[in-house]
Regions:
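Function-determining sites in protein domains
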Residues: 3-10, 17-155
């Protein structure tokens, strides 16, 4: 009996550790704080600008269908936590700042602020960060930026 226990215990410990490591690095879109509260009652704006400056800056105010599309895009994707706040390499040309305000009895409250850099990195303002560092997470969907642009361009 003890021999079986001695063989099974290390396997169980390894499986638990692997599960914990995976859950730490894997962020599901449904884990984003306040994402489920995003609705047509919110004022959602998206600012698209050049990564290296504010030339060609465009601002979009989203309608109800666009808000629902954005909510689905964010919730139905997954992201990979990074241990560094530094982005190394060539940055994409465009970045997107998503701001959702919720008006509660005349008092505006920021519900959600997300910064997206191209198709590669995303930051959920003060959420999923490590030791108070502002961390950009990797987007695991290779078509994320295309889908975001199609949401912004629909009327």
């Amino acid at each position: 009996m003890m021999k079986i226990f001695k063989r099974i215990l290390p396997i169980v410990i390894i499986v638990v550790v692997v599960g914990l490591v995976y859950s730490f690095f894997h962020i599901d879109g449904r884990e984003i704080k306040n994402i489920k509260k995003l609705s047509s009652d919110c004022k959602v704006s998206v600012v698209v600008s050049d990564t290296y400056g504010n030339e060609n800056r465009q601002e979009y105010e989203l309608n109800a269908n666009q808000i629902e599309g954005l909510k689905n895009l964010l919730m139905n994707n997954s992201y990979k936590r990074r241990l560094s706040s530094t982005i190394i390499g060539q940055l994409p040309e465009k970045d997107y700042s998503i701001l959702a305000d919720w008006d509660n009895d005349g008092t505006s409250q920021v519900l959600l602020y997300i910064k997206v850099i191209g198709n590669e990195y995303i930051n959920f303002s003060q959420q999923f960060n490590i030791f108070k560092h502002n961390i950009y997470h990797e987007i695991k969907n290779p078509d994320f930026e295309k889908e975001l642009i199609s949401i912004l361009e629909t009327e």
